[in-house]
Amino acid sequence: MFATFINYLDGVYLSAQDIGISLNDIRIVSQLSEHVLDNVDPGPYTAKGIYYALRSVKDHYFNGSNEDILIQGFGSVGSNLASHLLDEGTKIYVDETDEMKLNKALKLGCHPCKSIFKTSASIFSPCAIGGILNKEFIKNSTYKVICGGANNQLLSDNLFNEIHSHGMLYIPDFLVNAGGVIGLTKDVLERDDEMTDRALAKIGEVVKSIIDEFKLKNTIPLEFVKNRFL
């Protein structure tokens, strides 16, 4: 049925691995539809893009300080992101309901958290389900920056400016998680690993421009981001 629906869209939408759909699942779908991208697991590419975004946050927002980070979700994206950050000596807290995934995180050197509102982390990196950024989060959060790979993090778009009015810098998910699409399309665009990594690194450059705007105006209208980057 899923393949039938994708075929009905006739190429307007291309499906790929994501939450609830494994790479093996999508390869089965590819037997019934050509409108899929099943060449790679996008998770590591998404994670590398987030890493470049976070590195830009550390360099340009925190002036090089290696701030603590809370990663929510320790699947393909969260675990790969943690590996990059741990290599730099970053202290990482992990919010994960799956006990096996949490144990994996702890073995790597991450720290558990009982509540996302009770850690020393300055940066919140949501890499699980969407809708996590709601009024309760804004009210209780002490984070300075939100920068993660989960899709549709805002419960509603009108919370975008509200987050910034509370002094938090939110880097939009559709910019931060672009690495997944970059990885999925590398074969279609005939990019080698070096070209792909350069494309991923550009995510960090985009994040720098957002940080510059935030420092200048202490807010970032959603329209500014969409008009400039979409």
Feature annotation, model-predicted:
Residues 3, 7, 27, 47-55, ...:
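Predominant activation on well-ordered alpha-helical scaffold segments within soluble catalytic domains
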Residues 66, 99-175:
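Rossmann-like adenosine-cofactor binding region
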Residues 41-121, 125:
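Glycine-rich phosphate/diphosphate-binding loop of Rossmann-like nucleotide-binding domains
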Residues 144-228:
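Adenosine-phosphate binding glycine-rich loop
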Residues 12-17, 63-68, 214-226:
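Flexible, glycine/charged-enriched surface loops at secondary-structure junctions
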Residues 1-63:
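Glycine/serine-rich phosphate-binding loop and adjoining beta1-alpha1 elements at the start
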